[in-house]
Amino acid sequence: MLYNLLLPHIHNSHIANLFHYITFRSGLAIIITLSLSFITGPILIKFLRSLQKNGQPIRSDGPESHQTKAGTPTMGGIMIILSSCLSTLLLADLTNKYIWITLFGFISFGIIGFMDDYAKVTKNNHYGVRGKSKLLLQGIISLIICILLEYLDKNPSHLLNVPFFKNLSLDLGYFYIVFAIFVIVGSSNAVNLTDGLDGLATVPIAFTAGSFALISYLVGNLIYSNYLQLTYIPNTGELTVLCAGLVGSCLGFLWFNAQPAEVFMGDTGSLSLGGVLGIISVITKHEIVLAIVGGLFVIETASVILQVYYFKATKGKRIFKMAPLHHHFEKHGWAESKVVIRFWIISVIFALIGLSSLKLR
């Protein structure tokens, strides 16, 4: 909004000219989302506590230390969604189609998560909305997003770029739409599975969003994309502002979500954040890089899949003491804070590997 209002004056005012730069607006987005989180956080937490008498239901079969979390309110993802959307609407170019498509997906996945959290709180159990129903809704939203991208792009690309290899890409044809839906839905649920400990998912999400802030900027810049031999996608640079807002809102949320958490982001936050990262990876054509940068989310998801299939195949045996993987280490005797910090370190390593693919070809 500010960008669009100040655009006619960029040549007449030094302040207005600053808003011409994506980097300036991205930095401002981090400051604004952090500030909004600090201001609205205590108010929202107090409001959620007044509505949720018992807070988020705690699994009885989980680590014993988790029983101390009883009464902690959920749906804190509302804070992240509101601050991110407000900063984006304030600082991004509102004529950019990618901004509106991404915000649509972000909010839609947030609504699905809210429905799930609401069901858990009102029913006082951890089951929420049926898994198949959530997958169906996620699939429908992802399909709508893919159709919008196909319709609004003059020359939609169905190429899948392979990182670390020069000029290597696979033409998936219209099967790319199915693949894109898988990426978006998979990313949403992978982040959701990772969000099981205080602060665990928040920092890796911030690292991933920060990585895609850089990727969006480079892919949307003709000079940098040609230099790095990346697929140039015009207008994706504005997504840098949105990604920066995600970084700031996640860090602001971490202020209240650090152990011991005052609030959980819930599915409202995890499904929306995972979904928006998947959408941005599809738009920037860096779907495989998302799996690398967000490698922690992939590992957590793989641990659940392996546990379920092995349990069924062996009629009751388990690979891990508990899935997702972070609970396995808790059951193994690791303190929650140690699991969280070590997983943060792993997420940094994955982010660096993923970003190195931009240059190493």
From Swiss-Prot:
Catalytic activity of the protein = UDP-N-acetyl-alpha-D-muramoyl-L-alanyl-gamma-D-glutamyl-meso-2,6-diaminopimeloyl-D-alanyl-D-alanine + di-trans,octa-cis-undecaprenyl phosphate = di-trans,octa-cis-undecaprenyl diphospho-N-acetyl-alpha-D-muramoyl-L-alanyl-D-glutamyl-meso-2,6-diaminopimeloyl-D-alanyl-D-alanine + UMP
Q: In which pathway does it act?
A: Cell wall biogenesis; peptidoglycan biosynthesis
* Cofactor(s) demanded: Mg(2+)
What role does this protein play? Catalyzes the initial step of the lipid cycle reactions in the biosynthesis of the cell wall peptidoglycan: transfers peptidoglycan precursor phospho-MurNAc-pentapeptide from UDP-MurNAc-pentapeptide onto the lipid carrier undecaprenyl phosphate, yielding undecaprenyl-pyrophosphoryl-MurNAc-pentapeptide, known as lipid I.
Q: Which family does it belong to?
A: Belongs to the glycosyltransferase 4 family. MraY subfamily.
A GO molecular function term, named singly, is: UDP-N-acetylmuramoyl-L-alanyl-D-glutamyl-meso-2,6-diaminopimelyl-D-alanyl-D-alanine:undecaprenyl-phosphate transferase activity
Its EC top class is: transferase
PROSITE patterns noted in UniProt: MRAY_1 (PS01347), MRAY_2 (PS01348)
Q: Which organism is it from?
A: Rickettsia felis (strain ATCC VR-1525 / URRWXCal2) (Rickettsia azadi)
Under which name does UniProt file this protein? Phospho-N-acetylmuramoyl-pentapeptide-transferase
Q: Write out the GO cellular component annotations.
A: plasma membrane
GO biological process assignments: cell division; cell wall organization; peptidoglycan biosynthetic process; regulation of cell shape
Concerning Pfam families, the annotation shows:
Glycos_transf_4, MraY_sig1
How is this protein positioned relative to the membrane?
Answer: Multi-pass membrane protein
Compartments in which it is found: Cell inner membrane
Which InterPro entries does the protein's record reference?
Glycosyl_transferase_4, PNAcMuramoyl-5peptid_Trfase, PNAcMuramoyl-5peptid_Trfase_CS
List, alphabetically, the CDD domains matched.
Answer: GT_MraY
Q: Which UniProt keywords apply?
A: Cell cycle, Cell division, Cell inner membrane, Cell membrane, Cell shape, Cell wall biogenesis/degradation, Magnesium, Membrane, Metal-binding, Peptidoglycan synthesis, Transferase, Transmembrane, Transmembrane helix
Might you give the EC number(s) for this enzyme?
A: 2.7.8.13
Q: Kindly list the residue ranges recorded as spanning the membrane.
A: 28-48, 74-94, 99-119, 133-153, 168-188, 203-223, 236-256, 263-283, 288-308, 338-358
